Regions:
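GIY-YIG nuclease catalytic motif and its immediate N-terminal context
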Residues: 1-57, 61-71, 78-85, 102-104, ...
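Short arginine-rich
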Residues: 62, 85-98
Length: 127
């Protein structure tokens, strides 16, 4: 089995300009690691939020795939769709190996994306 390639970008950026927009292939998994869903999107932040809040019908919701464990960034949606199809055709072991290239502990890569940060008060105390 060939080793999957490591992605070039490990943190998503969501540019405001339409021409600068990226596409993403991502994997969300359940906390038990039993379920793993692969998808494609033009807005990774929004899509991850939808998965975390069970706003998406289907496999990911049914199996509680709330943790972003992997993603790749593409300039063209056609490339992202082709990559999604490629990954979906793999056996589970190969998908696991791909995740573990950048995320060996399978931590939620988006765990800090949706937190509200409180400003530090005058005394330096953070509420």
């Amino acid at each position: 089995m060939p080793v999957p390639r490591k992605p070039l970008v490990t943190r998503p950026e969501q540019p405001s300009g339409l021409l600068d927009r990226y596409s993403y292939v991502y994997m969300v998994g359940s906390s038990s690691r039993r379920a793993l869903y692969t998808g494609v999107t033009a807005n990774l932040n929004k899509r991850v939020y939808e998965h975390k809040n069970d706003l998406v019908e289907g496999f990911a919701r049914k199996y509680k795939c709330h943790r972003l464990v992997y993603f790749e960034t593409f300039e063209h949606i056609s490339d992202a769709i082709a990559r999604e199809k490629e990954i979906k055709g793999w056996r589970r072991e190969k998908k696991n190996a791909l995740v573990e290239l950048i995320n060996p502990r399978w931590k939620d890569l988006s765990e800090d994306w949706f937190r509200v940060r409180m400003p530090t008060g005058p005394s330096g105390f953070e509420p």
